[in-house]
């Protein structure tokens, strides 16, 4: 009976509160990122084996150029995250594009550092500085997209 009341209460809150729905969506996006970066990984014996990481879309393997999309994936992964964070907490941050870009970059950087530290401590994947950089870039792009949508909504 107690769990049924709790579920009804949460459902009612979900229907009534826009902020609660946005927070739920942010939790969903965050869980997708954590699944991709932490839960869906193999154990590594030495998580510090490639600290610098890949800084481009081409890497040399055994003298052969190979296309890698890791940097693009890191950028794309953080774009929706930071856009949803800005959408959820936009009223607290304000509409100034400088503030939005600063906060979206800062939040993406802190979230990325947290993921990399967890990968290091749990030995899931490798700690890479390039991941932190590209995730932060993705966060700023997400902030830019949020700014563009906010500006476009004024004219619609």
Give the location of each predicted region.
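Hydrophobic alpha-helical segments of small multi-pass membrane proteins
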Residues: 135-136
């Amino acid at each position: 009976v107690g769990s049924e009341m709790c579920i009804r209460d949460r459902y009612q809150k979900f229907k009534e509160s826009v902020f609660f729905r946005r927070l739920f969506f942010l939790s969903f996006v965050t869980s997708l990122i954590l699944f991709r970066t932490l839960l869906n990984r193999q154990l590594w014996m030495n998580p510090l084996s490639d600290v610098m990481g890949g800084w481009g879309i081409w890497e040399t393997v055994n003298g052969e150029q190979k296309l890698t999309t890791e940097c693009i994936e890191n950028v794309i992964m953080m774009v929706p995250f930071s856009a949803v964070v800005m959408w959820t907490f936009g009223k607290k941050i304000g509409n100034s594009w400088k503030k939005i870009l600063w906060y979206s970059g800062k939040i993406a950087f802190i979230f990325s550092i947290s993921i990399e530290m967890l990968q290091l401590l749990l030995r899931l994947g490798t700690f890479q500085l390039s991941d932190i950089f590209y995730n932060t870039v993705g966060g700023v792009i997400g902030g830019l997209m949020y700014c563009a949508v906010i500006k476009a909504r004024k004219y619609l």
